[in-house]
Each structure stands twice: as structure tokens, then as C-alpha cells.
Regions:
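Negatively charged
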Residues: 1-370
């Protein structure tokens, strides 16, 4: 036999491929490297893709010495039957855990005690890990910069991670997208360095926790942040949204949302399309909003069934698209007669299925094509 201590970055992946070709769990006495559970991997630094798409692997590798490993990117992605206890692993040198358990659909191994203090990337880590629900609240995530899609479609995860130090995180895109069970208090998170929160709670059907203390002053995109977050209904009025340029679909299908957002600074927003579409309960005073930079308002209040606030003072002079803006807005009959719509090119179905009955004969619609 080749001495297992000779496994290095150069031989590690070849050894895995060879032994799993003989036995799906690496329990093969005649392997030149010995049984997989006995391997000495102490010299290996890169374990990225190690068991990627190894759909039959469920070997016991709990005794591996992983103290030299820095990269575990995609290590168990699509390892669809893997479910072992890895809590004894030394991951203190690992910096990259991107997609580590993505699509590892039955994995719920104990990893609660991992020292993750060196990790900077956890994006996609538990994406579609539909069985994972371990208590990882004590993890040190203070160095992590990317948590994008970390728990996306992780359908049963609902652990207390409210004490995490997220002060280094810049990217939270889709972090809880489709995390249908998650409803934990994360109000104390430091989000001051996060620049994008788009899709963050999209489809997080049970999430309804206070977020008013979050510092979102660096966020430029809130696109679809609470889309399909059916029960979310919190006061967000304290948010500093002055850096944001994108709010498309932020409350689309957030059916219970009626939180106070009257003081939001939307002066840099360019896209408000579908912003309150099917936000059935929304009826807050947003009359003072500075909409002077908005160019897209199509479907903004589409099917916003109870909205009927005074938005007559809005500056819509830069808006190009207003199609279906109030379509199905069952209560809206606000006075918007003074709006400057001279830049609008599309107004199709703007007031369809709404009771709107104001005299807008003075509108300049010379640019409207549809």
C-alpha cells in the first residue's frame, strides 16, 4: 500500500475518485491508499469539490485531520445521501465554505462546535440542504463577508443565530430565500457594511421579526427583499435608505405588510416597479416621498387592494413606464391630476379594475405609445 500520509493536494482528489469507483463509501481494503476513514489528510489544504456529485457517498470521515485545509468550497455539493457527524473536524484554517453542503439533501450532521473564525465566504453554504437544522448559533462568523443565499431553500432550518457577529458581511442577497421555516430574532445583527439585500427574505413564509434597528445605510438594492414573505409586518420607518437605487418588488406579495415606511429617503430610487403589487393590506402615508429620480413605476400598486393615500405631490416627471400602475387597486381614487406625465411612454391598463375617477384631461400624454 502507498502510505496514506502521502496524500497531498496533488493526490487527494485522485484517491477519492479511485476508491469510490470501487466502493461508494470508500470502505475498500485493497485501495492503494487504504480505507477512506483511515486516510491521513493532514497535508491537504484544498478539499474543494471533494465529494461534489458523489451521490452514493456516506462514508465515515469524522476522524480526518483537516487542520491544514483552507478551502472546502463545494465539498459535499450534491452528495445527496451524505449524513455524517463532522463536529470533531478542525476547520480553523478554512477560509472558503462556499456551497459546501449545497443540495446535500439529507445532511443534518453535527457541526455545531466548528471554529469558523477564519471563514470569509459562506455563500450558498446550505442552499437546498433541506434536512439541515443544527444549532450553529455559536459560530464565529466575524470574518465572513459573503452570506448570499446561505440558507436559500433550506426548508426546515430555524435555529437561533441572532448573536452572530455580521459586521464584516457585505452581501446578503437571497440569504433566507425560500427558507420557509425560519423565524428567528436577528434584530441585533450589524448590517452596516451590507450593500445588497435583494431577495433576502423572498418566500420566507413564516418570517416576521423586528428589523427596525438594522443599519441599512450602505444598501443600494432592496429588490424583492420581502417578496412573498406573506406574514411579514414590521415597522421599518427608522431605516436610512438614502443609498438605495433599487426597490423593485420589495413588498410584492407581502400580503400582510402594512408597516410604517413614511420617512424613507427614496430620493435616489430609479425603479419602483411592482413595489407594492399584491401587498393587500398596505395603506401607509408615503405622500412625502421624493420620487424625482424614479423612471419605472409599472405595476407599482397593482392589486394593492386597500391603498388610497394622497400621492398627488409626487414628482413623476422622470417616469417612463406606468403600465398597470393602479390595476386592481380597488380603493384608489386619489387626486393625481397635477402629475407631470410628459415623459411617460406606456400607460396601458394603468387604471384597469380600479374605481379611479379623477379628471386627468390636463395630462400631457404626447409621449405615450401604449
Amino acid at each position: 500500500f502507498v502510505n496514506a500520509s502521502q496524500l497531498t493536494d496533488a493526490t487527494f482528489q485522485t484517491a477519492i475518485n479511485d476508491i469510490l469507483a470501487q466502493d461508494p463509501n470508500g470502505d475498500y481494503d485493497l485501495s492503494p491508499y487504504g480505507k477512506i476513514q483511515d486516510w491521513d489528510v493532514s497535508q491537504v489544504t484544498n478539499m474543494s469539490n471533494a465529494f461534489f456529485n458523489k451521490s452514493s457517498f456516506n462514508g465515515d470521515i469524522s476522524a480526518w485531520d483537516t487542520s491544514s485545509v483552507t478551502n472546502m468550497n463545494t465539498m459535499f455539493r450534491d452528495a445527496s445521501v451524505f449524513n455524517q457527524n463532522l463536529n470533531s473536524w478542525d476547520v480553523s484554517s478554512v477560509t472558503n465554505m462556499f456551497s459546501m453542503f449545497r443540495d446535500a439533501s439529507v445532511f443534518n450532521g453535527d457541526i455545531t462546535s466548528w471554529n469558523t473564525g477564519s471563514v470569509t465566504g459562506m455563500g450558498d453554504m446550505f442552499y437546498d440542504a433541506n434536512s439541515f437544522n443544527q444549532d450553529i448559533g455559536s459560530w464565529d462568523v466575524s470574518s465572513v463577508t459573503k452570506m448570499n443565499q446561505m440558507f436559500r431553500s433550506s426548508s426546515i432550518f430555524n435555529q437561533d443565530i441572532g448573536s452572530w457577529d455580521t459586521s464584516s458581511v457585505t452581501n446578503m442577497v437571497g440569504m433566507f430565500y425560500g427558507a420557509g421555516s425560519f423565524n428567528q430574532d436577528i434584530s441585533s445583527w450589524d448590517t452596516s457594511n451590507v450593500f445588497t439585500m435583494q431577495y433576502m427574505f423572498l418566500g420566507a413564509n413564516l418570517f416576521n421579526q423586528p428589523l427596525d434597528s438594522w443599519d441599512v445605510s450602505s444598501v443600494f438594492s432592496f429588490e424583492s427583499m420581502f417578496q412573498d414573505a406573506n406574514v411579514f409586518n414590521q415597522d421599518l420607518n427608522s431605516w436610512n435608505t438614502s443609498s438605495a437605487t433599487q426597490m423593485k418588488s420589495i413588498f410584492y406579495k407581502a400580503r400582510d405588510f402594512n408597516g410604517n415606511i413614511s420617512s424613507w429617503d427614496v430620493s435616489n430610487i430609479t425603479d419602483m416597479s411592482k413595489m407594492f403589487r399584491q401587498a393587500f393590506d398596505f395603506n401607509q402615508d408615503i405622500s412625502s416621498w421624493d420620487t424625482s429620480n424614479v423612471t419605472r413605476m409599472y405595476e407599482t400598486f397593482y392589486d394593492a387592494r386597500v391603498f388610497n393615500q394622497d400621492i398627488g405631490s409626487w414628482d413623476v416627471s422622470g417616469v417612463n413606464f406606468m403600465q398597470s400602475m393602479f390595476n386592481g387597486a380597488n380603493d384608489f381614487d386619489g387626486d393625481i391630476t397635477s402629475w407631470d406625465v410628459s415623459s411617460v411612454t406606456s400607460m396601458a391598463f394603468m387604471f384597469q379594475f380600479s374605481p379611479f375617477n379623477q379628471d386627468i384631461s390636463g395630462w400631457d400624454v404626447s409621449s405615450v405609445g401604449t
